[in-house]
């Protein structure tokens, strides 16, 4: 199925996404979207008949077993902290002074 990227498609996508683009942004999006679709069309042209489908590209996951461990004690947790006060980490203010 060939998708035609034109002004109508861009306007339709604008309406679906509830955004408003300037004329310049519409032209940029139209060009970028056309390039993306061309790329996927090239991928679709590949002959993959001799390629066995994979469920996952890695033979097994990299997850470790969820084994309970002793937590860090306060002294080790605060050892490399720049600012601490009364046994707590002092972070930067995020609101007000």
Swiss-Prot record:
GO process annotations (BP): glutaminyl-tRNAGln biosynthesis via transamidation; regulation of translational fidelity; translation
Keywords: ATP-binding, Ligase, Nucleotide-binding, Protein biosynthesis
InterPro entries given in the database record: Asp/Glu-ADT_sf_sub_c (IPR036113), GatC (IPR003837)
Source organism superkingdom: Archaea
Entry EC no(s): 6.3.5.-
Pfam families noted in UniProt: GatC (PF02686)
A GO molecular function held by the record: ATP binding
Catalysis performed (reactions): L-glutamyl-tRNA(Gln) + L-glutamine + ATP + H2O = L-glutaminyl-tRNA(Gln) + L-glutamate + ADP + phosphate + H(+); L-aspartyl-tRNA(Asn) + L-glutamine + ATP + H2O = L-asparaginyl-tRNA(Asn) + L-glutamate + ADP + phosphate + 2 H(+)
Similarity field: Belongs to the GatC family.
Oligomeric and partner information: Heterotrimer of A, B and C subunits.
Role noted for this protein: Allows the formation of correctly charged Asn-tRNA(Asn) or Gln-tRNA(Gln) through the transamidation of misacylated Asp-tRNA(Asn) or Glu-tRNA(Gln) in organisms which lack either or both of asparaginyl-tRNA or glutaminyl-tRNA synthetases. The reaction takes place in the presence of glutamine and ATP through an activated phospho-Asp-tRNA(Asn) or phospho-Glu-tRNA(Gln).
HAMAP family linked: GatC (MF_00122)
PANTHER family: GLUTAMYL-TRNA(GLN) AMIDOTRANSFERASE SUBUNIT C, MITOCHONDRIAL
UniProt name for this protein: Glutamyl-tRNA(Gln) amidotransferase subunit C
């Amino acid at each position: 199925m060939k998708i035609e990227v034109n002004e109508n498609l861009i306007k339709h996508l604008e309406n679906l996404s509830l955004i408003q683009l300037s004329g310049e942004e519409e032209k940029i999006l139209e060009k970028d979207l056309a390039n993306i679709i061309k790329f996927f069309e090239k991928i679709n042209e590949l002959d993959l008949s001799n390629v066995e489908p994979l469920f996952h590209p890695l033979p097994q996951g990299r997850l470790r077993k969820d084994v309970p461990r002793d937590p860090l004690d306060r002294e080790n947790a605060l050892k490399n902290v720049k600012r601490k006060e009364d046994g707590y980490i002092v972070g930067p203010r995020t609101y007000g002074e």
